[in-house]
Amino acid sequence: MTEKITLADALSNVEVLDELSLPDEQPCIEAQPCSIIYKANFDTNFEDRNGFVTGIAKYIEEATTHANLNVLLDEGQKHAVMLYTWRCCSRAIPQPKSNEQPNRVEIYEKTVEVLAPEVNKLLNFMYFQRKAIEAFSGEVKRLCHAEKRKDFVSEAYLLTLGKFINMFAVLDELKNMKSSVKNDYSTYRRAAQFLKVMSDSHTLQESQNLSMFLATQNKIRDTVKDTLEKIVGYEDLLSDVVNICVHMFETKMYLTPEEKHMLVKVMGFGLFLMDSDACNINKLDQKKKIRLDRIDRIFKNLEVVPLFGDMQIAPFNYIKRSKHFDSSKWPLSSSNAISPQADLMVHLPQIREDHVKYISELARYTNEVTTTVKENPSDAENRITADLALRGLQLLSEWTSVVTELYSWKLLHPTDHHQNKECPVEAEEYERATRYNYTSEEKFALIEVIAMIKGLQVLMARIETVLCEAIRRNIYSELQDFVQLSLREPLRKAVKNKKDLIRSIIMSVRETSADWQKGYEPTDDPVSKGKKDPDGGFRIHVPRLNVGPSSTQLYMVRTMLESLTADKSGGKRTLRKDIDGNCLMQIETFHNTSFYWSYLLNFSDTLQKCCDLSQLWYREFYLEMTMGRKVNKCMVRHQHNEECKDLITMEKRIQFPIEMSMPWILTDHILQTKEPSMMEFVLYPLDLYNDSAHYALTVFRKQFLYDEVEAEVNLCFDQFVYKLSEQIFAHYKQLAGSIFLDKRFRLECEVLGFNFQSYPRNNRYETLLKQRHVQLLGRSIDLNKLVTQRINANMHKSIELAISRFEANDITGIVELEGLLEANRICHKLLSKYLALDNFDGMVKEANHNVLAPYGRITLHVFVELNYDFLVNYCYNAATNRFIRTKVNLSSTQAIQREKPPQMSHYYLWGSKQLNAAYSTQYGQYTGFVGSPHFHAMCRLLGYQGIAVVMDIILKDIVKPLIQGSLLQFTKTLMIAMPKSCKLPRCEYGSPGVLSYYQAHLTDIVQYPDTKTELFQSFREFGNCIIFCLLIEQALSQEEVCDLLHAALFQNIFPRPFCKENEKPEAKQKRLEAQFANLQIVSNVEKIGTAKQAMIAREGDLLTRERLCCGLSIFEVILNRVKSYLDDPVWCGPPPANGIIHVDECSEFHRLWSALQFVYCIPVRGTEYTIEELFGEGLNWAGCVMIVLLGQQRRFEALDFCYHILRVQRVDGKDEDVKGIQLKRMVDRIRRFQVLNSQIFSILNKYLKGGDGEGSNVEHVRCFPPPQHPSVISSSSHYQDPQKLRQSMNN
């Protein structure tokens, strides 16, 4: 069987859903989202009045009249909407240019067809205003009848008459304002007359009437005034209407801002209607029928009120236009002092204080509701909750009024270029009223108040169900307690004293609204007979239900009770004199309290109206007033119009740009100022679009207005996301740049007084980045996703810029590139806390074009710079271990042409202009040389694959063509120029003689024209290639060692711990291993991972451990590859004649290099560049590498010409000038180069011998006999094989 679930259980299950946490839990920094919900409207407009037959018949009749007047008010609202939202049609309709135009008839027919429905609306409007004036004047006439003057008129009825006065004022001002209505009707009438559509006299007369009605200014106002002046005593009734408005305004007997402003408009227009030839309002003031001083104070505090939409009016203007206006009676309103309404900063402290107090109280109540469950709260708790809800609505209404009143005042008081220096002279009217009419402080205050309104609206809407239930229970209990209990005493006295009218009214109240427990009034109640209760009291149990009274019920109860306390009651004396004072106070208190019940019962609608700020977007009045004109250029300062003679262009448009729209002005102000305290409020001004769209659909019911709101929202939100994304990226990029900046450098800057504000202030972007579903025009927008998309693009641009910047510089830019990428990585890490950005390494690969290609832009540019600039133009110095650019360019290649990096904002580089300057200074240190920092950066950026590619290309495209090309050709040429034989002269010749000997034999080599240019340049390029490969390997080895040290802790590798005496190192080592056991990758993966994961972990661990232990050497491979290129016979020469070694012959490369070394050891004159300055040590490295690879090192060291001069000079110590060469200077140079060559040979031999086996230290010795003197050597036996000699001796 299916289990039955009670309603209580079902409801409790639904309430449990509130405990479910949303997956995103985004901070609430936006207004109430618009949801699709069912709203029940229990306002019946007195349709159920006939059901209350027990009520006083007079008030039921009044309810009938009320219902009819409300229908007229609703119809008037529709006509007001029609007029306000009217857009000029005639401007869009083509007009015939001449009477001979062939399609003139067709144009007129289409004009009539298009405009006929709109003209019918205007006719209906004219008929309506007649009907409404007749109905209003009829009611005034009825109430002003001599027999009715002393009759009681209810507060609600007087308020309805006030609403009529307000309606007439609004309709009249709208009709006056809309010139497009007159233009459209003129266009229609012209077309209709041409086509003779209006043929009958009645139609013509109505057309004429409509034309006059539209053309006459203040037609409705004057008609109402003329009609009322014919009614005797109308001023007394209007005095009551004005007085009730004054009373309600001063006692805050209103709830929505619209009602508050309506009261003020009724005061102004009502006094204007009263002031006539027959009635002087100043005399009425003297008679105390009205209080002008109180109204004057109200008019001063509220100089301007919204009229309709963006239309506004100064109520005091009605008084100024009255017949008996006396400025002395209006001292405050006539003064030039600015109204408090115009200064939002005056209201702000109190608003903040009220907001904090109320939010605290509401939060406490919300926490209490969510943490404790009470099935039936007490009456006191319900009353507190209802009061809390009412106070919240009142605060919201008050704050909304402050905003709309300020906006209205600003619209009526636009600024100009004299008051605001930022306002251009040619700024148009609406622009001066909105864009330039608010100071920065006012904008921030406006944003803050709007945020308070929208934020509180969200909080109250969240607990709407709880509040509404408490409101209904409280209203029910208070109404029933009052009717069933509090009215017993006045009823008893009325029965006892035979006050039949009072008794009948009280009985009607009880019968209308009492909800007796048994369904009927107790028959044995002593009160009904005027008797006292028994000694034990008469017990009446009042039920408690969750239901409120109907609108008609509430109206009947309040009106009948009001009749008991009113000053007018229709008789000679008022009824209140017959009621006990205590009871009278109870009735008045109940009457005042119940005024708000209709608002509370419609809590949702009231909350919406109290927070409605749609007025801040609408601009129909200004569109009509300016007709969309924008003055592009006019040389004269005046109010521009179409007749301006100096006007060059006047553009017409149907809408204002977003820069003049208040929602965007406020939103953009936050984004422009980047004020941290306001950043979390940035979504609240955008909610003004929600209000405007809601108003367009529910009140105006105009699709085109909604479309315009939607179009602006589309544009503004795109701008908002774009600007916000740029700001967030710039903020975090600046933060990353500040974090990455060298701390010592920053400290030195601060010491020197250069403060570049490196660390940006916290701007509270985190809250915005957590917004996953921003509600805008019914759309749920993932702001986080949109910002992520844009910041992803910005990250790509930033990385792209870093690489492009490197491509625009020489090889020294590699250090800055690494820094830029690291700053971007930090920025990416900071942003990744809130945004799902692409993988940073993937971004770098994509920007580097290295996703699928074996090498990327960085590798390619490194090689290009090496090939065309670095290898050919840089000189190496072993003392500093750096390359520097040569002073003279001897390269045959053209200078490299680099593209300029793209121009982008500062934040794409390092984050800000100041940081860019700081980093430019910091990385400027690395631009004058290429050294260890550059090689380390290359290793980290290129990686193994990039390094392998670069080295492979260097060998194939640079080294091999050099060796087998230019160097080979030069070697062959110079070998021919070398002497056939060049001996080592004996020491007896002395060092000057030896030098002269070599100088004479090597004349051709010394004087060879290309030796010190092309030949040495080729050797320099070759040597630089070798040095580059060596330094790259050294840097790579250091990086690998660093990786190993970093990984040691995770591989169970610990440094030997320090041990005290009598402490075993093994025990301490074990404690260390146990302490860091959780960090051991392999063991942990083997425990909790799969077999495949464990295998991968073991292989990774093995690779990390053995990477450097294998003794792998890139440089050895490089040398062996180079050795393979030295395959031409010219390098080794022909076999020696003696079968052993060339001693005096110049047929091997080392002899040529000895000659070249003799050339560059010759001292230069004072003004010439030395070989070291021109070519660096790459020249020496090239020769030494080739000598070692050819196996000629020992021969070179033994038979070198320069070394021989050095050895001889050390013995004799002579210093002479030998044919222009200072011997001592040359010997000094020889010694330096000998040391350098020894170092190079040492390095090369270390790498080349590192690859041999363990027995490589065993030398293969060949035995030769000692040399003999030529005189004892026979011609036939110049040389004997030692083996043969041994054999002959044995034989």
Swiss-Prot record:
Residues 1269-1291 are annotated as: Disordered. Plays a role in guidance and morphology of central and peripheral axons and in synaptic morphology. Also required for formation of cell membrane protrusions and for bristle development. It is found in: Cytoplasm. It holds the Pfam family FragX_IP. Keywords: Cell shape, Cytoplasm, Developmental protein, Differentiation, Neurogenesis. GO terms for biological process: axon guidance; cell projection assembly; chaeta development; cortical actin cytoskeleton organization; regulation of actin filament polymerization; regulation of cell shape; regulation of synapse organization. GO terms for molecular function: small GTPase binding. The keyword GTP-binding does not apply. Interacts with Fmr1 and Rac1. Component of the WAVE complex composed of Hem/Kette, Scar/Wave and Cyfip where it binds through its C-terminus directly to Hem. InterPro entries: CYRIA/CYRIB_Rac1-bd, Cytoplasmic_FMR1-int. One of its GO terms (cellular component) is SCAR complex. Belongs to the CYFIP family. Residues 1271-1291 have a biased composition (Polar residues). This is Cytoplasmic FMR1-interacting protein.
